[in-house]
Amino acid sequence: MGSTGSVSAWDEALLIAAIQYPVPIIRGPEDIQVQVQQICKTMDSTKAGYPDLDFIVFPEYSAQGLNTKIWTYDEMLLSLDSPEIDCFRRACIRNDVWGVFSIMERNEDPSQIPYNTAIIINSNGEIVLHYRKLQPWVPIEPWMPGNLGMPVCEGPKGAKLAVCICHDGMFPELAREAAYKGCNVFIRISGYSTQVNDQWIWTNRTNAWQNLMYTVSVNLAGYDEVFYYFGEGTICNYDGNIIQQGQRNPWEIVTAELFPRLADKARENWALENSIFNLGCRGYVGKPGGERANYLTWVRDLANGEYKLPWDENIRIRDGWKYYPEGVKLGPLPKIDE
């Protein structure tokens, strides 16, 4: 159960707003500051329009954009203690709202590739979840694969929150990992271009249905002089049905009223639909208690570091390909000759 969301919500309802943020055009670090200020102003205006709002979600790359020529250089990156993050913290406190934000995060080892990161900040201005993208969109994205797993945190109104970033959501294993750890509201922030528009909608729905959890997904919108980004924020019920879906408009605010307790009750009381439970105790009618032994070859091989496809040797693209023929560039921004 859920509703499309409005300006008010009752006590058990989690009122959430997903912002189809216009894709930023970033030519240097000064442009990042402009976007950070605009994100914070957007929080102020959205809360003013939706006074009962609990949670606001911004897409991947909303602060730092997708300028692939410079996006890995030092000046283009942020850390959790950067002043820009303090701006997000203050905006959450000022508006008494939780927020999800995207940053391209410096690696602790400056000789190593940066991370693509999402953070959740609570209404007290505290970072309560820190996630690094597990599945960068190769070969376009150069980011270091995440090393923090799939964390889950307590949220408002009974929500148990997890975040994935863009292409992560194409892997059913990652949504299942979040659900297995208790998540009942799974957030997906994205900077996808139109190549995978339909697949975006399918996976938002299947991630919800297969795990009996709400999914809240939002993408950048607009054109950045290279790609067009499709917006289409999608909020799905725990039965996989769409509660609310945006169009392709930049600045569209996709809202919904969620009831996390109902997702929990579905997990506890549904039978035929309870795939996440049935996965681990197969055929509990024919075999009391169900069969619990691992029966999946790929699970065993992945756990042993031996994951290999039958066609592995024929896979053509497995490095930086035409996007990074000379490798990923690190260090300070190159000086432009006068």
Curated annotation (Swiss-Prot):
<feature type="active site" description="Proton donor">
    <location>
        <position position="133"/>
    </location>
</feature>
<dbReference type="InterPro" id="IPR003010">
    <property type="entry name" value="C-N_Hydrolase"/>
</dbReference>
<comment type="similarity">
    <text>Belongs to the carbon-nitrogen hydrolase superfamily. Aliphatic amidase family.</text>
</comment>
<feature type="domain" description="CN hydrolase">
    <location>
        <begin position="14"/>
        <end position="260"/>
    </location>
</feature>
<dbReference type="InterPro" id="IPR022843">
    <property type="entry name" value="Formamidase"/>
</dbReference>
<keyword id="KW-0378">Hydrolase</keyword>
<dbReference type="GO" id="GO:0050126">
    <property type="term" value="F:N-carbamoylputrescine amidase activity"/>
</dbReference>
<comment type="function">
    <text>Is an aliphatic amidase with a restricted substrate specificity, as it only hydrolyzes formamide.</text>
</comment>
<dbReference type="GO" id="GO:0004328">
    <property type="term" value="F:formamidase activity"/>
</dbReference>
<dbReference type="InterPro" id="IPR050345">
    <property type="entry name" value="Aliph_Amidase/BUP"/>
</dbReference>
<feature type="active site" description="Nucleophile">
    <location>
        <position position="166"/>
    </location>
</feature>
<dbReference type="GO" id="GO:0033388">
    <property type="term" value="P:putrescine biosynthetic process from arginine"/>
</dbReference>
<dbReference type="InterPro" id="IPR036526">
    <property type="entry name" value="C-N_Hydrolase_sf"/>
</dbReference>
<feature type="active site" description="Proton acceptor">
    <location>
        <position position="60"/>
    </location>
</feature>
<protein>
    <recommendedName>
        <fullName>Formamidase</fullName>
        <ecNumber>3.5.1.49</ecNumber>
    </recommendedName>
</protein>
<dbReference type="Pfam" id="PF00795">
    <property type="entry name" value="CN_hydrolase"/>
</dbReference>
